[in-house]
Structure formats: C-alpha cells, structure tokens
Amino acid sequence: MATASNNITLTTAPTTLFDPSVDGHAAAFSITNRVGSAGNVLINIAGMHKAGDFRGIAPGLDKAFVNASAGIGLVTAKSDSTATVDCGVDRV
C-alpha cells in the first residue's frame, strides 16, 4: 500500500491537489469543498485512477474521510473557518 501526503486548504473555492507519487502514475484530484452552516465540509473528488481512501486530520477538524470509489465525502469541522488538512491517499 502506497501513501502520499499532501496539504490542502479547505475553503469555499475549488482546489486542485496533484499527486504524482502513487504507483508511479500521475493522479489529479479535483477537490470542490463547501463549508456549511453546521460546520460540514463537502468534498467532491474526481480524477482518481483507482479506488482508495482520502484521509486528513488537522486542528480545526474533527475528522476527514472520503471513499474515493464513491467520489464524495463529508468532513466534520469544528468551525467554518479555513483549515489546512494533511491528506494521505492510500491504495492497495
């Protein structure tokens, strides 16, 4: 299982995460996130070349988990402020 760590910032604007290190193939992650009034951040991931997990833990966030095969995940945030997440992409 290969793991690649990246930093993204959760904002209301679309963000692109590029990870060239998984299995020697380039994988582009198009991340659109929205901070809701209840402190939820919805992340849509497109462009993953195989199924995997997208995880992140950071101050200001309770947890972050996205199932890449579903392409959608919910991040529970402690506040609506912008937070930086250390993201890992795990694949078997």
Q: Where are the model-predicted features located?
A:
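Edge beta-strands of jelly-roll/beta-sandwich modules across compartments, strongly enriched
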Residues: 40-43, 81-91
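Surface-exposed loop/edge segments in extracytoplasmic proteins
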Residues: 2-5, 49-55
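Beta-sandwich interaction modules
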Residues: 16-21, 56-72
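Short, surface-exposed beta-strand/strand-loop-strand elements in extracellular ectodomains
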Residues: 34-51
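Surface-exposed ligand/attachment interfaces on beta-rich extracellular proteins
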Residues: 1-23, 36-38, 80-83
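Extracytoplasmic low-complexity repetitive segments enriched in small/polar residues
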Residues: 1, 23, 28, 68, ...
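Noncatalytic modules at the cell exterior or secretory-pathway interfaces
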Residues: 24-31, 66-82
